[in-house]
Amino acid sequence: MTSLEDSIKVEVKTEYIEGQSSPTEERYLFRYTITIVNLGEKAVTLKSRYWSITDANNHNSEVRGEGVVGETPTIEPDSAYQYTSGTVLETPLGVMQGSYTMITGEGESFKAQIPPFRLAVPGMLH
């Protein structure tokens, strides 16, 4: 690995939650499952998160906070951490992206990028 940033791989799976959504009220609920894989040689702790969420109307919201789902997990080398969370959009289509602030046991801080991923009601895109 060339850098600490390259040592973290973020994988995302999304799901539209139809039963808790209400299109007539412009409420579309999506669940996302994130897997954070530590490909590096050092254990890292996830300290905080940053999300940029954009819907189909180009409305952008930003979310910052400590940890994820109430935890600040430490991810050992060649290990992964997975969690599930959700978000509500006013449109049936949107994009999320962001970063995690990570720290090594030696106190080195870095940002692990979360690549853009699509939130879409099934059938919205061909």
UniProtKB/Swiss-Prot annotation:
It comes from Shewanella sediminis (strain HAW-EB3). This is Protein ApaG. The gene is apaG. GO terms for biological process: error-free translesion synthesis. SUPFAM superfamilies: ApaG-like. It comes from the Bacteria. It holds the Pfam family DUF525. Residues 2-126 form the ApaG domain. Signal peptide: none annotated.
